[in-house]
Protein backbone atom coordinates (compact mmCIF):
# COMPACT_ATOMS: atom_id res chain seq x y z
CA UNK A 1 0.00 0.00 0.00
CA UNK A 2 1.21 3.48 -0.87
CA UNK A 3 0.76 5.77 2.14
CA UNK A 4 1.74 9.42 1.79
CA UNK A 5 5.14 9.12 0.08
CA UNK A 6 6.18 5.68 1.32
CA UNK A 7 5.20 2.03 0.89
CA UNK A 8 3.83 0.08 3.84
CA UNK A 9 3.46 -3.64 4.46
CA UNK A 10 5.01 -6.64 6.15
CA UNK A 11 7.86 -6.53 3.66
CA UNK A 12 8.69 -2.93 4.61
CA UNK A 13 10.03 -1.32 7.81
CA UNK A 14 7.27 -0.26 10.18
CA UNK A 15 5.91 3.27 9.96
CA UNK A 16 4.90 5.44 12.91
CA UNK A 17 1.73 7.41 13.60
CA UNK A 18 2.39 9.60 16.64
CA UNK A 19 1.51 12.87 18.31
CA UNK A 20 -0.49 14.29 21.18
CA UNK A 21 -3.93 12.86 21.87
CA UNK A 22 -5.63 16.22 21.39
CA UNK A 23 -4.41 19.49 19.91
CA UNK A 24 -3.71 21.68 22.94
CA UNK A 25 -1.98 24.61 21.24
CA UNK A 26 -0.33 25.48 17.95
CA UNK A 27 3.12 25.77 19.50
CA UNK A 28 2.90 22.39 21.24
CA UNK A 29 1.76 20.75 18.01
CA UNK A 30 4.60 22.26 15.99
CA UNK A 31 7.22 21.53 18.64
CA UNK A 32 6.05 17.93 19.17
CA UNK A 33 5.86 17.24 15.44
CA UNK A 34 9.31 18.76 14.97
CA UNK A 35 10.84 16.62 17.69
CA UNK A 36 9.24 13.47 16.31
CA UNK A 37 10.38 14.32 12.79
CA UNK A 38 13.96 14.70 14.04
CA UNK A 39 13.85 11.38 15.92
CA UNK A 40 12.23 9.37 13.12
CA UNK A 41 14.41 10.99 10.49
CA UNK A 42 17.56 9.92 12.33
CA UNK A 43 16.21 6.38 12.70
CA UNK A 44 14.84 6.11 9.17
CA UNK A 45 11.26 5.48 10.32
CA UNK A 46 8.46 6.83 8.08
CA UNK A 47 6.35 9.19 10.19
CA UNK A 48 2.85 10.67 10.19
CA UNK A 49 1.91 13.27 12.80
CA UNK A 50 -1.37 12.63 14.62
CA UNK A 51 -3.55 14.84 16.81
CA UNK A 52 -7.29 15.37 17.32
CA UNK A 53 -9.29 18.58 17.02
CA UNK A 54 -12.18 17.06 19.00
CA UNK A 55 -12.36 14.20 21.48
CA UNK A 56 -16.01 13.29 21.05
CA UNK A 57 -15.86 10.23 23.33
CA UNK A 58 -14.64 11.76 26.59
CA UNK A 59 -15.80 10.06 29.81
CA UNK A 60 -17.26 13.27 31.23
CA UNK A 61 -18.96 16.28 29.69
CA UNK A 62 -16.68 18.42 31.87
CA UNK A 63 -13.51 17.09 30.19
CA UNK A 64 -11.56 19.09 27.61
CA UNK A 65 -12.65 18.05 24.12
CA UNK A 66 -10.38 20.13 21.93
CA UNK A 67 -10.05 23.38 20.02
CA UNK A 68 -12.76 22.56 17.48
CA UNK A 69 -12.57 21.66 13.82
CA UNK A 70 -11.81 25.08 12.34
CA UNK A 71 -8.94 25.93 14.69
CA UNK A 72 -7.70 22.35 14.79
CA UNK A 73 -7.48 22.09 11.02
CA UNK A 74 -5.69 25.42 10.85
CA UNK A 75 -3.07 24.14 13.29
CA UNK A 76 -2.67 20.82 11.48
CA UNK A 77 -2.22 22.74 8.25
CA UNK A 78 0.54 24.77 9.93
CA UNK A 79 2.21 21.60 11.20
CA UNK A 80 2.14 20.23 7.69
CA UNK A 81 3.55 23.46 6.23
CA UNK A 82 6.13 24.39 8.86
CA UNK A 83 7.37 20.95 9.91
CA UNK A 84 6.94 19.25 6.55
CA UNK A 85 5.31 16.03 7.71
CA UNK A 86 2.05 14.34 6.67
CA UNK A 87 -0.77 14.68 9.20
CA UNK A 88 -3.61 12.47 10.41
CA UNK A 89 -6.69 13.25 12.45
CA UNK A 90 -9.90 11.48 13.38
CA UNK A 91 -13.43 12.36 12.37
CA UNK A 92 -16.64 11.52 14.19
CA UNK A 93 -19.41 12.76 11.89
CA UNK A 94 -20.07 12.36 8.18
CA UNK A 95 -20.31 16.15 7.82
CA UNK A 96 -16.70 16.49 9.03
CA UNK A 97 -15.20 14.27 6.35
CA UNK A 98 -15.07 16.70 3.41
CA UNK A 99 -13.48 19.70 5.20
CA UNK A 100 -11.03 17.48 7.07
CA UNK A 101 -10.01 15.58 3.93
CA UNK A 102 -9.13 18.89 2.29
CA UNK A 103 -6.43 19.49 4.93
CA UNK A 104 -5.02 16.19 6.21
CA UNK A 105 -3.19 13.37 4.48
CA UNK A 106 -4.83 10.48 6.34
CA UNK A 107 -8.22 10.07 8.03
CA UNK A 108 -8.83 7.95 11.10
CA UNK A 109 -12.10 6.44 12.30
CA UNK A 110 -12.77 6.02 16.05
CA UNK A 111 -13.02 2.46 17.33
CA UNK A 112 -16.55 3.02 18.61
CA UNK A 113 -17.75 3.78 15.06
CA UNK A 114 -16.27 0.83 13.18
CA UNK A 115 -19.70 -0.79 12.73
CA UNK A 116 -21.40 2.37 11.42
CA UNK A 117 -21.76 1.40 7.77
CA UNK A 118 -22.72 4.79 6.34
CA UNK A 119 -19.87 6.46 8.22
CA UNK A 120 -17.26 3.92 7.08
CA UNK A 121 -18.49 4.17 3.49
CA UNK A 122 -18.37 7.97 3.54
CA UNK A 123 -14.81 7.94 4.88
CA UNK A 124 -13.80 5.42 2.23
CA UNK A 125 -15.20 7.65 -0.50
CA UNK A 126 -13.16 10.67 0.67
CA UNK A 127 -10.27 9.62 -1.54
CA UNK A 128 -7.90 9.69 1.44
CA UNK A 129 -6.16 6.75 3.12
CA UNK A 130 -8.13 5.71 6.21
CA UNK A 131 -6.83 4.12 9.41
CA UNK A 132 -9.85 2.12 10.62
CA UNK A 133 -9.69 1.26 14.31
CA UNK A 134 -11.14 -2.03 15.49
CA UNK A 135 -13.78 -1.61 18.17
CA UNK A 136 -12.95 -2.81 21.66
CA UNK A 137 -16.04 -5.01 21.33
CA UNK A 138 -15.12 -6.59 18.00
CA UNK A 139 -13.45 -9.92 17.26
CA UNK A 140 -10.36 -9.50 15.08
CA UNK A 141 -11.77 -11.67 12.29
CA UNK A 142 -14.81 -9.37 12.11
CA UNK A 143 -12.56 -6.58 10.83
CA UNK A 144 -12.68 -8.26 7.43
CA UNK A 145 -16.31 -7.16 7.11
CA UNK A 146 -15.38 -3.60 8.05
CA UNK A 147 -12.53 -3.42 5.55
CA UNK A 148 -14.76 -4.98 2.89
CA UNK A 149 -17.37 -2.24 3.46
CA UNK A 150 -14.67 0.37 2.88
CA UNK A 151 -13.39 -1.37 -0.25
CA UNK A 152 -16.86 -1.75 -1.73
CA UNK A 153 -17.57 1.93 -1.10
CA UNK A 154 -14.29 2.94 -2.74
CA UNK A 155 -15.03 0.74 -5.74
CA UNK A 156 -18.51 2.25 -6.07
CA UNK A 157 -16.88 5.69 -6.20
CA UNK A 158 -14.23 4.65 -8.70
CA UNK A 159 -11.45 4.99 -6.11
CA UNK A 160 -8.56 2.66 -5.20
CA UNK A 161 -9.62 -0.23 -2.97
CA UNK A 162 -6.26 -0.56 -1.20
CA UNK A 163 -6.40 2.70 0.75
CA UNK A 164 -7.30 1.26 4.16
CA UNK A 165 -5.50 0.09 7.29
CA UNK A 166 -6.83 -2.08 10.12
CA UNK A 167 -5.81 -0.86 13.57
CA UNK A 168 -5.82 -2.94 16.78
CA UNK A 169 -6.32 -0.99 20.03
CA UNK A 170 -7.18 -3.68 22.56
CA UNK A 171 -10.32 -5.57 23.54
CA UNK A 172 -12.64 -4.97 26.48
CA UNK A 173 -11.72 -7.24 29.38
CA UNK A 174 -14.26 -6.75 32.13
CA UNK A 175 -14.99 -3.26 33.39
CA UNK A 176 -12.50 -0.40 32.91
CA UNK A 177 -9.87 -2.62 31.37
CA UNK A 178 -8.49 -3.71 28.01
CA UNK A 179 -6.35 -6.63 26.98
CA UNK A 180 -4.22 -7.05 23.85
CA UNK A 181 -4.49 -10.46 22.21
CA UNK A 182 -1.45 -10.61 19.97
CA UNK A 183 -3.10 -13.28 17.84
CA UNK A 184 -5.43 -10.56 16.57
CA UNK A 185 -2.57 -8.91 14.68
CA UNK A 186 -2.01 -12.08 12.65
CA UNK A 187 -5.75 -12.67 12.25
CA UNK A 188 -6.33 -9.13 10.98
CA UNK A 189 -3.81 -9.71 8.19
CA UNK A 190 -6.56 -11.79 6.60
CA UNK A 191 -8.33 -8.53 5.76
CA UNK A 192 -5.59 -7.91 3.20
CA UNK A 193 -5.06 -4.46 4.71
CA UNK A 194 -1.88 -3.31 6.45
CA UNK A 195 -2.21 -3.87 10.20
CA UNK A 196 -1.37 -1.11 12.67
CA UNK A 197 -0.97 -1.61 16.43
CA UNK A 198 -2.12 1.19 18.74
CA UNK A 199 0.27 0.75 21.65
CA UNK A 200 -1.05 3.55 23.85
CA UNK A 201 -4.82 3.11 23.75
CA UNK A 202 -4.19 -0.58 24.37
CA UNK A 203 -2.96 0.29 27.89
CA UNK A 204 -5.89 2.61 28.58
CA UNK A 205 -8.22 1.93 31.52
CA UNK A 206 -11.48 3.28 30.03
CA UNK A 207 -13.34 5.40 32.55
CA UNK A 208 -10.99 4.06 35.21
CA UNK A 209 -10.68 7.39 37.03
CA UNK A 210 -14.39 8.01 37.34
CA UNK A 211 -14.76 11.09 35.15
CA UNK A 212 -11.76 10.28 32.95
CA UNK A 213 -9.84 7.27 31.67
CA UNK A 214 -6.79 5.95 33.40
CA UNK A 215 -3.87 4.16 31.85
CA UNK A 216 -0.68 2.21 32.43
CA UNK A 217 1.95 3.82 30.23
CA UNK A 218 4.67 1.60 31.69
CA UNK A 219 3.25 -1.24 29.60
CA UNK A 220 3.44 0.64 26.28
CA UNK A 221 6.98 -0.62 25.56
CA UNK A 222 5.94 -4.15 26.55
CA UNK A 223 3.01 -4.32 24.14
CA UNK A 224 4.81 -2.40 21.40
CA UNK A 225 7.69 -4.88 21.47
CA UNK A 226 5.25 -7.79 21.39
CA UNK A 227 3.39 -6.35 18.40
CA UNK A 228 6.60 -5.74 16.50
CA UNK A 229 7.66 -9.33 17.24
CA UNK A 230 4.37 -10.60 15.77
CA UNK A 231 4.85 -8.40 12.71
CA UNK A 232 2.90 -5.26 11.86
CA UNK A 233 2.99 -2.65 9.13
CA UNK A 234 2.74 0.29 11.50
CA UNK A 235 2.66 1.44 15.11
CA UNK A 236 0.41 4.13 16.57
CA UNK A 237 1.51 5.89 19.77
CA UNK A 238 0.35 9.03 21.50
CA UNK A 239 3.04 11.07 23.18
CA UNK A 240 3.22 14.30 25.19
CA UNK A 241 5.98 16.61 26.45
CA UNK A 242 4.49 16.35 29.97
CA UNK A 243 1.93 13.52 30.25
CA UNK A 244 0.97 14.49 33.81
CA UNK A 245 -0.35 17.80 32.45
CA UNK A 246 -1.92 16.43 29.25
CA UNK A 247 -5.51 17.50 28.66
CA UNK A 248 -6.51 14.06 27.36
CA UNK A 249 -5.18 10.52 27.84
CA UNK A 250 -2.10 11.56 29.80
CA UNK A 251 -1.96 8.30 31.81
CA UNK A 252 -1.30 6.23 28.69
CA UNK A 253 0.85 8.73 26.75
CA UNK A 254 4.54 8.08 26.17
CA UNK A 255 6.74 10.89 27.54
CA UNK A 256 8.19 12.62 24.48
CA UNK A 257 11.69 12.40 25.95
CA UNK A 258 11.40 8.58 25.90
CA UNK A 259 10.31 8.21 22.29
CA UNK A 260 13.80 7.97 20.81
CA UNK A 261 14.84 5.10 23.09
CA UNK A 262 11.60 3.21 22.49
CA UNK A 263 11.65 3.65 18.73
CA UNK A 264 15.30 2.57 18.56
CA UNK A 265 14.41 -0.74 20.19
CA UNK A 266 11.35 -1.23 17.98
CA UNK A 267 13.39 -0.56 14.84
CA UNK A 268 15.87 -3.30 15.75
CA UNK A 269 13.12 -5.80 16.58
CA UNK A 270 11.20 -4.96 13.41
CA UNK A 271 14.23 -5.67 11.24
CA UNK A 272 14.78 -9.02 12.97
CA UNK A 273 11.12 -10.04 12.70
CA UNK A 274 10.81 -9.23 9.02
CA UNK A 275 14.19 -10.67 8.15
CA UNK A 276 13.24 -13.96 9.83
CA UNK A 277 9.92 -14.25 8.02
CA UNK A 278 6.57 -15.51 9.27
CA UNK A 279 6.62 -19.22 10.03
CA UNK A 280 2.91 -19.20 10.91
CA UNK A 281 2.16 -18.91 7.20
CA UNK A 282 3.43 -22.49 6.79
CA UNK A 283 1.33 -23.99 9.60
CA UNK A 284 -1.60 -25.08 7.46
Curated annotation (Swiss-Prot):
Subcellular localization, as worded in the UniProt entry: Cytoplasm
Keywords: Cytoplasm, Lipopolysaccharide biosynthesis, Transferase
Cleaved signal peptide residues: none
Catalyzed reaction equations: D-arabinose 5-phosphate + phosphoenolpyruvate + H2O = 3-deoxy-alpha-D-manno-2-octulosonate-8-phosphate + phosphate
Domain of life: Bacteria
Enzyme kind, highest EC tier: transferase
Pathway note: Carbohydrate biosynthesis; 3-deoxy-D-manno-octulosonate biosynthesis; 3-deoxy-D-manno-octulosonate from D-ribulose 5-phosphate: step 2/3; Bacterial outer membrane biogenesis; lipopolysaccharide biosynthesis
GO molecular function per UniProt: 3-deoxy-8-phosphooctulonate synthase activity
GO biological process, one term: keto-3-deoxy-D-manno-octulosonic acid biosynthetic process
E.C. numbers: 2.5.1.55
GO cellular component, as recorded: cytoplasm
InterPro entries per the UniProt record, alphabetical: Aldolase_TIM, DAHP1/KDSA, KDO8P_synthase
HAMAP family attached to this UniProt entry: KDO8P_synth (MF_00056)
NCBIfam families: KDO8P_synth (TIGR01362), PRK05198.1 (NF003543)
Protein family according to the UniProt entry: Belongs to the KdsA family.
Annotated protein name in UniProt: 2-dehydro-3-deoxyphosphooctonate aldolase
Amino acid sequence: MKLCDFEVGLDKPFFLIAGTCVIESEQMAIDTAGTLKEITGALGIPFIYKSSFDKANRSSDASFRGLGMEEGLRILSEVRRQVGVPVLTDIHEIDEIKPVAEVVDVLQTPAFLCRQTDFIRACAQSGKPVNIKKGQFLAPHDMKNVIDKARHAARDAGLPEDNFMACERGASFGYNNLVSDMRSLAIMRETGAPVVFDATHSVQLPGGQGTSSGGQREFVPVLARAAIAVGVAGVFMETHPDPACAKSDGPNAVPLRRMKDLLSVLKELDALTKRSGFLENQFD
